[in-house]
């Protein structure tokens, strides 16, 4: 009997533990919280900021919607780094040591809306980044070491409304990249060493249309060339830009035609401090201004009309002159004929008198 009682008690305890475990799995507020993190089930947020973490914690609660990982030492994000928190909506990775953003690290986050990666050491982002986060609305890449951004994202970033890249090392920004963000309403570009040459004309044209349609931007301030140093890109007239030409095999591709500068007869090669040619500069051959066919046709028509009018006026003047001369001659001829007739009659009378 005693053994049977002990067996029954053991089975009852196991059943209770199993029930408690099942309830713990079903309740979103119950579960493990990563060490050095603060979990707030009421707001579905996990705060792991300022804990000296070198990697993303593994045991994050599946109910996490907001994840704060700023002020750590995270330098690398593995593939599917956040697969355990598929409901994640806001991710803060600012002030870490990230040098690259791999698209694979963000796979499995269809609900991510806000991504903050400011104050890292980012050198570039992958062109497939938009594929990994199609629902992203705010992307902040400020205060990094970005020197170049992808020309194209491969597909439109349909939902992005905020794009911030201020305080980086960007020299140029391709217009095609911004055109892939049809819903963007805020673009932050300040504090980059923008080279306002022919390569930045596309960005200027895009910004003009963007601001005209109600978009907001802090503008791009030129670092080079010297005549435009410190001036806003939008304030430089279009006429000072020369179209960029494709680099020739016989000519060094490191030369640049600066806005407002006269074309050079001989190209001069420029090398950077390492002795290599700078691929960011190119010589733009001046092209003749394209002829406007409509203006040419109008000029020809107007010239023809003017010439026709002049010819008609000359013809009218000639006719008038001839008519006037004929009439004048006719009136002047009558008195002369009468005088001659009178003279003849007088001579005849004189002869008749002499004969008599």
Curated annotation (Swiss-Prot):
The keyword Signal is annotated on this UniProt entry: yes
Glycosylation positions in this chain: 92, 116, 159
Cited Gene3D superfamilies: Ribonuclease Inhibitor
UniProt cross-references to SMART domains, sorted A to Z: LRR_TYP, LRRCT, LRRNT
Segments on the Extracellular face: 33-299
Signal peptide annotation: 1-32
Claim: Cell wall biogenesis/degradation is one of the keywords in the record: no
LRR repeats: 63-84, 87-108, 111-132, 135-156, 159-180
Alphabetic keyword roster: Glycoprotein, Leucine-rich repeat, Membrane, Repeat, Signal, Transmembrane, Transmembrane helix
GO cellular component labels: membrane
Residue spans of biased composition, Polar residues class: 255-277
Residue ranges annotated for the LRRCT domain, each copy included: 192-246
Chain ranges of the LRRNT domain: 33-62
Residues annotated as transmembrane: 300-320
Subcellular location: Membrane
Disordered: region residues: 255-288
GO biological process terms held by the UniProt record: positive regulation of synapse assembly
Annotated InterPro entries: Cys-rich_flank_reg_C (IPR000483), Leu-rich_rpt (IPR001611), Leu-rich_rpt_typical-subtyp (IPR003591), LRFN (IPR050467), LRR_dom_sf (IPR032675), LRRNT (IPR000372)
Cystine connections: none
Name by which UniProt lists this protein: Leucine-rich repeat and transmembrane domain-containing protein 1
Organism: Mus musculus (Mouse)
Upper lineage: Eukaryota, Metazoa, Chordata, Craniata, Vertebrata
